[in-house]
Swiss-Prot record:
Pfam families, sorted: Ribosomal_L28
Any one of the GO BP annotations: translation
Superkingdom of the source species: Bacteria
Protein family membership: Belongs to the bacterial ribosomal protein bL28 family.
Keywords for this protein: Ribonucleoprotein, Ribosomal protein
GO cellular component: ribonucleoprotein complex; ribosome
Official protein name in the record: Large ribosomal subunit protein bL28A
NCBIfam families per UniProt: L28
Gene3D superfamilies on file: Ribosomal protein L28/L24
Record keyword Repeat present: no
Length: 63
């Protein structure tokens, strides 16, 4: 599944995992992306990948 929101274009964040011995390895934090059926126009729905912060903010009308 894509790790990019179709509404706000939020993508993964990158950084390092730091172990107890301070070894650093690359990692990424993915946004919480959900596949939902969203209403694009009245009577017209399509599947979209939307982050949960957009769902919670009401930026998407589920249909």
């Amino acid at each position: 599944m894509a790790a990019v929101c179709d509404v706000c274009a939020k993508g993964p964040g990158f950084g390092k995992s730091v172990s107890h011995s301070h070894r650093r390895t690359n990692r990424r934090w993915n946004p919480n992306i959900q596949t939902v059926r969203a209403q694009v126009a009245p009577g017209n729905t399509r599947r979209m990948n939307v982050c949960t912060s957009c769902l919670k903010a009401g930026k998407v009308v589920r249909g």
